[in-house]
Amino acid sequence: MFSMCKQTHSATAVEFSIACRFFNNLDENLVVAGANVLKVYRIAPNVEASQRQKLNPSEMRLAPKMRLECLATYTLYGNVMSLQCVSLAGAMRDALLISFKDAKLSVLQHDPDTFALKTLSLHYFEEDDIRGGWTGRYFVPTVRVDPDSRCAVMLVYGKRLVVLPFRKDNSLDEIELADVKPIKKAPTAMVSRTPIMASYLIALRDLDEKIDNVLDIQFLHGYYEPTLLILYEPVRTCPGRIKVRSDTCVLVAISLNIQQRVHPIIWTVNSLPFDCLQVYPIQKPIGGCLVMTVNAVIYLNQSVPPYGVSLNSSADNSTAFPLKPQDGVRISLDCANFAFIDVDKLVISLRTGDLYVLTLCVDSMRTVRNFHFHKAAASVLTSCICVLHSEYIFLGSRLGNSLLLHFTEEDQSTVITLDEVEQQSEQQQRNLQDEDQNLEEIFDVDQLEMAPTQAKSRRIEDEELEVYGSGAKASVLQLRKFIFEVCDSLMNVAPINYMCAGERVEFEEDGVTLRPHAESLQDLKIELVAATGHSKNGALSVFVNCINPQIITSFELDGCLDVWTVFDDATKKSSRNDQHDFMLLSQRNSTLVLQTGQEINEIENTGFTVNQPTIFVGNLGQQRFIVQVTTRHVRLLQGTRLIQNVPIDVGSPVVQVSIADPYVCLRVLNGQVITLALRETRGTPRLAINKHTISSSPAVVAISAYKDLSGLFTVKGDDINLTGSSNSAFGHSFGGYMKAEPNMKVEDEEDLLYGDAGSAFKMNSMADLAKQSKQKNSDWWRRLLVQAKPSYWLVVARQSGTLEIYSMPDMKLVYLVNDVGNGSMVLTDAMEFVPISLTTQENSKAGIVQACMPQHANSPLPLELSVIGLGLNGERPLLLVRTRVELLIYQVFRYPKGHLKIRFRKMDQLNLLDQQPTHIDLDENDEQEEIESYQMQPKYVQKLRPFANVGGLSGVMVCGVNPCFVFLTFRGELRIHRLLGNGDVRSFAAFNNVNIPNGFLYFDTTYELKISVLPSYLSYDSVWPVRKVPLRCTPRQLVYHRENRVYCLITQTEEPMTKYYRFNGEDKELSEESRGERFIYPIGSQFEMVLISPETWEIVPDASITFEPWEHVTAFKIVKLSYEGTRSGLKEYLCIGTNFNYSEDITSRGNIHIYDIIEVVPEPGKPMTKFKIKEIFKKEQKGPVSAISDVLGFLVTGLGQKIYIWQLRDGDLIGVAFIDTNIYVHQIITVKSLIFIADVYKSISLLRFQEEYRTLSLASRDFNPLEVYGIEFMVDNSNLGFLVTDAERNIIVYMYQPEARESLGGQKLLRKADYHLGQVVNTMFRVQCHQKGLHQRQPFLYENKHFVVYGTLDGALGYCLPLPEKVYRRFLMLQNVLLSYQEHLCGLNPKEYRTLKSSKKQGINPSRCIIDGDLIWSYRLMANSERNEVAKKIGTRTEEILGDLLEIERLASVF
């Protein structure tokens, strides 16, 4: 069985985050990684353009509200295991160090020339002698970097340290000279100067023979040589054995002398508590480190005695280490994350989501004398924490949305003496209890998503520093207050615990929900619903991968080819200046003018011309005027009054118009470009033709005028910092923090520098030190607020395939790209090194343009261009180039060399292979063409339609056969969403009206004008449009009940419990434990089943089932069982299997519950109460009910290792057959009479049920051990495969082939294909392949095939699809060529990544046979010439491959 695996929704979980200067040394960026995705964000002001004009950045004291903006995304062929950054000697930016399993390390850096990641060095330590006999893949390769950037270390296989030394920056002069002079030395001389020196290995046993089971490694601050702390446990223990062996952890500090390669141990601490988790170094001037254990915090320093506190009463019994109980605190640091926000303060995020601020109270000797804990907020469950710009904190999460918080420290400067401390702290404790109640409500993450502003300026922390001194002395304390405020959140749909497909709810024209009964399964519109998140971050996520617009109304207009909407004179309107007033429809020979208000009416006798076809209509002069362009005229109107009519008489019709207010650019059929500008002299507006023109040969085939607000399009070099904004204002004052403090006199300043008088400015506390460093960093957001002056540019494409950029109005050529239709990854200026004098008018025609003919003969010609500023306030310009085969989407990035300081980097490429060819046939009769050319022709209708506000979003609509929306929001990520169905959109316009707010209108193939809105409940700034319904508890299993069209969901809530059952034989008694105030009680789970209606996505009231305490739901399915009394029909029932988890001493027992959902008359005013749940059967079983399914109308249950078949009769279950299997069956699926079961440890088995004999028998099984997570059938016409996902993140396909010799006569299932996915899959379902689309390929190759959709615990979605053999062979050859053809990011080989991974040595080779869809799809993004070369190598045509890809894309876009 040949198949392909492709990921369609990338992972959204965040596991690692660091702050680093990724693009340049001025700006700090946030780099996050999760699974195999790496993203780079910047913190940017969230200020609209209208507000920004009123702000003066230099006068603002406080930073505005901030947002996270994604600047780069990289998908890797390997999961990130550890992420760090380092500043290398003489580098313009930081380098990233990323480790991968089992022992790979890549050093990477941003490449400013191509806006890509370049690999600086690769380090590989997976040889067998380094492995030391280990076959398991248990060890995480942890990377740590010395704070002074002298070296980095990586722990491999838990037994060895890799040391990566960095060269010191000795001579700055040499580096500066090297930038200027060409290097003529031999390559060997170059190698010796690289910033990264040769790496080497240290075996930990050589340092100390006891070092084993390493828990954490960290570098200490402030040592002359790099000093590494290693926390390890030489002899392991566990909580059940601490009476025998406790305090097993040891901390050693090793000094790394890199030159001599000697590594003495300089400091050892023995007998640390057995539950040590991590160690955190503390910066100078305090120094030392904090050791975090599950129940305690310990401060260690080489020169002072240790100081530790216990955080709960468990620490008192589990360790002999001297710990002082911490008053008022009862927490556990298990699964907690930590980050220093100051030298003496760190934020702790607990596994419950609570945020605490821990202050180290330091005495005058810089020794930690006390800890002060303070509960600051309740937030998301974090996986990592990172501090940015010293006042922002990023909480990365795998289980909920990641958050960006802003924290500010207010200084009340209240001076109090030690006597007041006691009363103060008591009073504060009372205040805090009240405050905590409010905080729990404010800071819970899902409410933040809905109303982040509520959380503004809440008082979070009001804390005093406790100072221990002699009682007589009055020590001075300062009260400090922290304010936390949520700025932004990143959507995350991980982990996908369970998912299913359900029917989509349709909306009728009047907004009523409509549930059409599909004629056939092929017409069924389905959506993907997933149970995502955990605990209070739990949610139901509804995914759609095609937008289904809500059609408000539609009417038929025969012969209309194009549509526009425009505004009336903005000065006449008082408030509603953003609503469209006129709609113009162009027909082949005429134009319709409609006025749009409460109603849409045709108007006549206006200044608009109606007896000619309109080419374009738009607004000019800040929406005060309207310009209408026909094939022969340009008309300027104010409202409906004609002001000016400019005839265009150049012997050829106008075919394309582009506007950048106040410029109007026209393209004439014969290749000329005419530009007009709006001038208002003495109050009379008129359009003036620009006397500057551009050459008309080779003929211009596409134009786009662009008004730049981003400041990227500039030819000046002096106003360029290396930042993303142009700023002459702040370029000079970037060293602003060197200015005198306002409260210092000048003479004091000199004393401070040179004399003793400086002692007047001694620091009060550690915090004052940090305050000064904070002030110096406050320039960064001011730079981002400076507004760039608008500039105007004309982008044209010529018949020769070149793309040219001209500055307006002087029409000077500033940028020239050869062969733009080739679609190179980076577009560069061919004139970068041409003297500017050549770009004058005379020389440009002959000299440059002739020399720039396309290099590649087969490059498709550009047919249409669009340059549009997307993102917030148009700060992210995109270039869209449409050719016959595809749409190329480029982003603009700053490039300081060259004339115009930009380059273009390809972001994505859309396959438009189905579009009808639009080139002109040359064999037509010339006279006929002359008459027709002045009429409106469909081939000239623009396919790229920019819009400013559709549902609050701006972007581009790509019309045609595969219509789709292209969005790039303020979050900075490109989103492409297709329209559902196989409709062809002819033309499109945004439409804002009283009745249709922020909607749009479009023509489909039937000449129907559809007025629609985007459904507002979906979030479009996501890989797939998604709706997240918060549940505030963990969602477990989820099923769709098709008869009643309702979702059934199992939820789990957790709360501490003080009671438990004591068992005496069969009797059980409930006993209550009381362990004191500081004891942390265990967590108990309460399960419940609820119904959720897909019309409102609310829980149906009074239709839930609450299970008993201690009863866990282990299996849940909708089963089709035979009706009572009638043998023919089957009815859907809800079947739930449970298990009572009491303790390890009691045999597990469970219940089988069977329920029916019945419809009743809803209560008045409560339409949701139409469902009730009726219990059919409930009975205790002799074991845990671990899996459920149905076969031929019978019920199949797995009770641990036994499989039972039951018949439902008279409200009771009657046993029919049973069989014993391996260890513990946790999943059962059936098809016809075959039962496919998954064992938790012993792989899979195939059973057969024979109804006439009432027997259940084992047909075949896999003999190798395998920890199975999920199973599903692979249906390929008449072939049946068994798809399995396992604990090692692989996908394996088995088949039953009794004729094959190696199957031992059918006893053994054969492994036919395997593939390493790299993410854990727990849930899958099947969908039948349907042929959708206008131009259907014959024959349809995917008849009777099913594809399997999977969801991962990292928030990714994908599918496995059986391929026809012909397509598989073509893809396999393509895959083999691409493996060596493309450069490997981070040095990771896709083939190695996709090879089956196993920790046990098995005597079988990898089967492969599954195509890597992600690698195949990368073929689309290659340049046209490269694609042709690759296709030639495998003996096929590019169109064949692109056709296959398009067909598979169509099959998969059913949601």
Swiss-Prot record:
Localization in the cell: Nucleus
BP term (GO), one: mRNA 3'-end processing
Superkingdom as given in the UniProt entry: Eukaryota
Entry keywords, A to Z: mRNA processing, Nucleus, RNA-binding
Chief location of this protein within or outside the cell: nucleus
Manganese listed as a keyword: no
InterPro entries: Beta-prop_RSE1/DDB1/CPSF1_1st, Cleavage/polyA-sp_fac_asu_C, RSE1/DDB1/CFT1/CPSF1, WD40/YVTN_repeat-like_dom_sf
GO CC annotations on file: mRNA cleavage and polyadenylation specificity factor complex; nucleus
Keyword RNA-binding carried by entry: yes
GO molecular function: mRNA 3'-UTR AU-rich region binding; myosin binding
Quaternary data: Component of the cleavage and polyadenylation specificity factor (CPSF) complex, composed of at least Clp, Cpsf73, Cpsf100 and Cpsf160.
Task of the protein: Component of the cleavage and polyadenylation specificity factor (CPSF) complex that plays a key role in pre-mRNA 3'-end formation, recognizing the AAUAAA signal sequence and interacting with poly(A) polymerase and other factors to bring about cleavage and poly(A) addition. This subunit is involved in the RNA recognition step of the polyadenylation reaction.
Entry-linked PANTHER family: DNA REPAIR/RNA PROCESSING CPSF FAMILY
Record family assignment: Belongs to the CPSF1 family.
Protein name from the UniProt record: Cleavage and polyadenylation specificity factor subunit 1
Protein's organism: Drosophila melanogaster
